[in-house]
Amino acid sequence: MYKVLLVLASAAALKRPERALKVRGGELGLNAETAIQVGTWVTGLSGAMAYVDPKGNLENYGITTAQASGIDNMRWAGANQLTLAAIFAADPEQAVGLSGYYAAWNLIASAPATLATGFPKAAIYGWAAVCAVLGKKTLSGDVSPWALVAVWGLNGIQQHFMQDQCVEMYGAKKPTALGKSMMGIAGQTMILAAVYMGALVKGKSQAEAFAYSWIAGALFGAKWAFTEADNFNAPKAGPLAWTVIGAGIAYACLKE
């Protein structure tokens, strides 16, 4: 999977050389507009592969032994990546409000996986309703956009750093080590969404917000490579590929 992402990222960058590449001081480089397009497509593709074939996606990263908990939470992580790609693709002025609707879709679309891990229907569909209402109220200006940023960020922090407490709070099944790790990846994706939208709310440009999100993503990739990959006999190359891609995209967005 990570090899495919690297190839696609390179191909996308070269697809429209007259717009994607420019010379500055003799240096040929990727511009911010194309970096955003590349990053959005890479995120969406990765999410689609994880959602449609979570077991196969794990195998692409060298994880060949996966129980139901790991597979279900890989699908949940994939749904979150697809949602993050949709937020990236949205008009920056409406991205935060739309993220409420996207979150509702995410929760409903991934319900078969999250229900299988023991999360109750009331929590899943209740959160979907809350997010949809917040999305509507944010777009109409009746609610501060920081409310949705907080929902994304706090839920992401809980799922990435406090999986045991999250499972206990909702009365879900205790996950396997891989299931817990994949829940962490789902959580980190929520954090990336919160970083992006928080930067937009603070008045940063889309390129700056995109860069900050990908810097965070690069750090999470390195974190997983050096703290979790060995637990599953997974090569470090996969998560570190995300670190390399993230660093490159962030550089392209911030250098102008």
Predicted regions and their residues:
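Core segments of alpha-helical transmembrane spans in multipass integral membrane proteins
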Residues: W41-A50, A68-E93, L98-L107, L154-N155, ...
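N-terminal chloroplast transit peptides
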Residues: M1-K22
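Membrane-helix boundary connector in multi-pass membrane proteins
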Residues: L107-A122, F220-A237
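Membrane-water interface at the C-terminal end of transmembrane alpha helices
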Residues: M49-A50, V130-D142, I245-E256
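Transmembrane alpha-helix/helix-exit interface in multi-pass inner-membrane proteins
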Residues: G44-E59, V149-M169
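Hydrophobic cores of alpha-helical transmembrane segments in multi-pass inner/ER membrane proteins
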Residues: N80-A86, G126-G135, M190-V195, T243-I249
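Cytosolic juxtamembrane helix and N-cap/initiation of the first transmembrane helix
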Residues: G25-T43, A68, K137-W152
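Interfacial loop at the N-terminal end of multi-pass membrane proteins
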Residues: K55-M74, D164-M183
